Amino acid sequence: MIGNRRLQTYTPWELVIEKLPEGAPNIATSKLKWDPAYQEKVGVVTKAAELDKKMVDKIERLSKKIYRTLFLSGYARLDYRVTDGGDIYLLEANPNPQIADQEDFADSAKHCGVDYEALLQKIIGLGLRYRTGA
């Protein structure tokens, strides 16, 4: 999500392990996150989450509440685990996520029509206006 006072959420993004070995935990370990050969082996894909509108709305409301509760500003990524039963668990609030082009945060913004250059301009602008309360 992005913003200081006025918050905007981007498309929920998910990490999928397409070839998860049987019995292996569905957890993003450091090896899974940072080892390209292992990512290839287990079929790691990141993409827009396949959620119904009701769940997306619920996640957006929860995200805004958490963002404000933690006094976040500028931009942040909130990582969740959503159960098959629809329960939502916050795993991490990351106030400084990777913002490189073609990484999850930038891809989620692109999915909402915000290209990379515009995303960076928005982040810079929010930082410059932070102290003024804009």
Task: Give the predicted meaning of each segment.
Residues 1-61, 84-89:
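Phosphate-binding site of ATP-dependent enzymes
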